[in-house]
Regions:
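Membrane-anchoring hydrophobic helices of lipid-metabolizing enzymes
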Residues: 1-72
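Catalytic core of membrane glycerolipid acyltransferases/transacylases, capturing the structured
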Residues: 18-27, 36-39, 66-126
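Short gly/ser/thr-rich secondary-structure transition/capping motifs
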Residues: 52-59, 129-130, 186-189
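Generic preference for hydrophobic
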Residues: 58, 74, 97-98, 204-206
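Residue-level preference for the first positions of well-ordered beta-strands
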Residues: 71-73, 143-149, 177
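Short glycine-rich anion-binding loops that position phosphate/pyrophosphate groups of nucleotides
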Residues: 78-80, 151-155
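A cross-family acyltransferase "interaction/gating" segment
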Residues: 108-111, 145, 156-221
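Anionic-ligand binding region
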Residues: 128, 132-136
Length: 241
């Protein structure tokens, strides 16, 4: 209770301010560039990381912070919406997320999603899903950084759920490197606490890039291989927790 009261008092004014600014920017995209809109969202995400007292323990943080002209596909496991907040707070280069279309109907969230040009996928439509995979892949090929939560939805367990077919399709069109990202304890920043407002430790690992050649050599097993790499690191995090 104490934690959420503090978060509401500290975060709500900032989110409301961001909402108003982005509503204006989204209506005048010819005047406000994508990079400028992303900076507004990023500043809000950095503030949310701060007010939730989230301490990110990161392996290979230079991978996401380094300047790079080529596009990438970040492939992450998924426990919490706060993973997107942390990724945006870390990346100066704009990130484009692939998200289920239902999220685009959530107040406040939809405004921020629109500002950072989130690509929405309809999981009930195979045709639309294929179109989204192609669009995301082409944008990565054109030097954009794409973020995919490859399980398709948040894991209800403490393990990584099987990866969906979208991953190899996107990499096929992207023809670029893939960065695997493992999150551990990423539900903690938004966990309800009754009588405390503690620092929340989240463990993150950015893997070394997987080349497009690796995909070509492992097409049939690609989703399984990448899933197992992240699961192995998650198991390591859990053993050390």
């Amino acid at each position: 209770m104490i934690k959420w009261l503090c978060i509401i008092l500290l975060a709500v004014p900032r989110v409301l301010y961001s909402q108003i600014v982005l509503l204006i920017m989204n209506c005048k995209k010819d005047k406000y560039s994508y990079e400028r809109r992303y900076r507004v969202v990023r500043n809000t995400c950095k503030w949310l990381v701060k007010v939730t007292r989230t301490k990110m323990n990161i392996e290979n943080v230079d991978i996401i912070k380094s300047r790079h002209e080529n596009g990438r596909v970040y492939v992450c496991n998924h426990f919490s919406v706060f993973e997107a907040v942390m990724l945006i707070s870390l990346s100066e280069k704009p990130l484009i997320f692939i998200s289920k279309k239902e999220n685009s109907k959530v107040p406040f969230l939809r405004t921020h999603m629109k500002a950072v040009e989130t690509i929405c996928i309809d999981r009930e439509s195979v045709k639309q899903s294929l179109k989204v995979c192609k669009e995301a892949g082409i944008r990565a090929k054109d030097n954009a950084d794409i973020v995919l939560f490859a399980e398709g939805t948040r894991s209800k367990t403490e393990d990584v759920s099987p990866f969906k077919a979208a991953l190899p399709m996107i990499v096929h069109y992207a023809e670029t490197e893939v960065i695997l990202v493992c999150f551990h304890n990423s539900k903690n920043p938004v966990k309800f606490r009754w009588l405390s407002y503690p620092k929340e430790n989240v463990n993150i690992k950015f893997f070394e890039p997987l080349s497009y050649q690796y995909y070509l050599e492992n097409k049939k097993e690609y989703a399984i291989l990448t899933h197992d790499m992240i699961q192995s690191k998650l198991d390591e995090f859990k053993r050390g927790n």
